Amino acid sequence: MVTYGELLEIIGYTLVENDMTETICRHMDEYRGEYTNSIFGLFLEISKGLGLVCKGIEMQAFVQVGTLLRQLYEQIATAIVLQNHPETRKTFNDLSKIKTELITTNKDKNDASETLYNQKKDLISGQPRRRDFFEYGWLLEIEGCHSLGSRELLKQANLFDIAAWKEFFNNFVHNKILAIQMTDEGMSFYTNEFVYHAAIIFDRFMCAYHQATDYNFHIAGRSVRFDFENCFNEITKQRKS
């Protein structure tokens, strides 16, 4: 029977032991462009984040792992939407620059932020908070999209079925669940769940990265993607039985 440990080994082997960072940086130089850099930057953060998740699971650092997985779901969703909707990339970059300037100057708004907000605010259902607009306003470039927030982002990335789990991970972000409070059964349960959610993100990462670069995830004569899909599918069947 395939185990969660085998699934985790494949993810760690791909991202940590074989330094996926070097591969992504090489492809970033090869496909360099004003807007593609944002996508490859996300790929880089996802790869590093999943590598940390693998190490964190081994260390039973559950609070850190839960926090990382919550962030990684948003990052992979963002990469998928930017990849599938090129019309969003300019606004995404514009908002990223504005956010960076606001953070570094410790301001809530500036001329650039107000101009962009006033241009787009009528497209949004309800009364949006400026913070949500600067985080997710680029989604408005998608035809028919009038909502902002992480749930809308996951929906646009076809990841809406895990929205409830993403919210659950907030419990770790806010230290509501600590490993020291868990029974052995609880630790086993969360370890398996963390591995499975890391696998979901890794699966989407491989698909998106292959779409962007044609990279086939063959490493040292091993078809990592083939091994992973077999293991992931078997674990998924076990979970449904």
What is each of the regions a protein language model found here?
Residues M1-S241:
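A cross-kingdom marker of C-terminal helix-rich interaction/assembly modules
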